[in-house]
A protein has these predicted regions:
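Domain-level signal for soluble alpha/beta catalytic cores
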Residues: 1-290
Length: 290
């Protein structure tokens, strides 16, 4: 990908490498007995921004500062609004999904991952992006309405392509668990719960509008850039709103070290929802002893 970005190879060569590595990945997933297959997000520069860059109204450029992770700045493009949000034509992730779907069989289903609506909202409502966002929108409500419409249209496209398993990746809740999380969201500690409800609300508007036979789950973590993290804190601070009120079918929750706290907040998860515990870390090469 770096060679492509530097102009040393063309898109066809990049896509050939992507196709080959994704095919190899899916083969390994099947060999190991996994019933859900993905493309490993191998076609993306970042796990979340590529989705946004494909939309009308979103601009980006190389960053001069990065985002402050623990011990390292995450060097990802500055991403901001330059116009009203709209999905014109087919989103490129839909074709990415089609490539994986061809490998489905009686034992496997293809899953698509995207940043959650809350993650999208956070990107453009963080303090450093407020000026550009409200240069395009007269109110937060109008912006949120367009976010919901863009997601609804994307999900329609994805569903029509045969997707029945969608995962919303969401680091906003991990940031809410941080002691200084309120600063990131431009509020006070006392105002954090209302902000959480706003982010939960935009997620639920999109989830509730999805087709009934589309399984929608969410993955929550505290950031991962070169195995560093952006926040720390237990799920207690978000248990009521996220675990108790978000309308997903299942939660995939990071629990791979002491930064995640204990399991007590899981008591807030309704009985009709599933929880998958992320106990095995991807951040260190050492294998767990049990």
């Amino acid at each position: 990908r770096r060679a492509f970005d530097n102009g040393n190879i063309g898109y066809d060569e990049l896509k050939k490498v992507e196709d080959e590595t994704i095919t190899e990945l899916v083969s390994k997933l099947k060999e190991l007995g996994y019933h859900v297959i993905t493309d490993g997000e191998f076609r993306r520069a970042t796990w979340y921004l590529d989705f946004m860059w494909a939309l009308d109204g979103v601009g980006h450029k190389p960053t001069k500062t990065g985002l402050p992770f623990h011990g390292e700045d995450a060097i990802v493009d500055d991403t901001y609004l330059v116009g009203k949000l709209k999905l014109s034509g087919e989103h490129p992730f839909v074709d990415h999904f089609r490539f994986v779907k061809q490998f489905e069989d009686e034992n496997t289903v293809a899953k698509q991952t995207i940043p959650s609506p809350a993650q999208f909202l956070a990107q453009f409502l963080f303090p450093f992006n407020l000026e550009s966002t409200f240069a395009q929108y007269e109110s937060e409500e109008a912006f949120i309405d367009d976010v919901v419409e863009v997601y609804n249209e994307f999900i329609r496209q994805l569903y029509d392509a045969g997707c029945r398993n969608l995962q919303l990746d969401d680091c906003t809740w991990g940031m809410f668990t941080n002691k200084s999380g309120s600063i990131l969201f431009g509020t006070t500690k006392e105002g954090t719960v209302e902000v959480q409800k706003k982010y939960k609300g935009v997620n639920n508007r999109v989830i509730d509008a999805a087709p009934d036979d589309l399984v929608v789950t969410t993955h929550v973590c505290r950031g991962n850039y070169h195995s560093t993290y952006i926040s720390s804190g237990p799920y207690d601070a978000v248990a009521d709103v996220l675990l108790g009120e978000e309308n997903v079918s299942a939660f995939f929750l990071e629990f791979d070290d002491e930064r995640s706290g204990g399991f007590e907040p899981l008591a807030k998860v309704p009985e009709d929802k599933k929880v998958v515990l992320g106990l095995v870390t991807t951040k260190r090469p050492e294998l767990e002893d049990k």
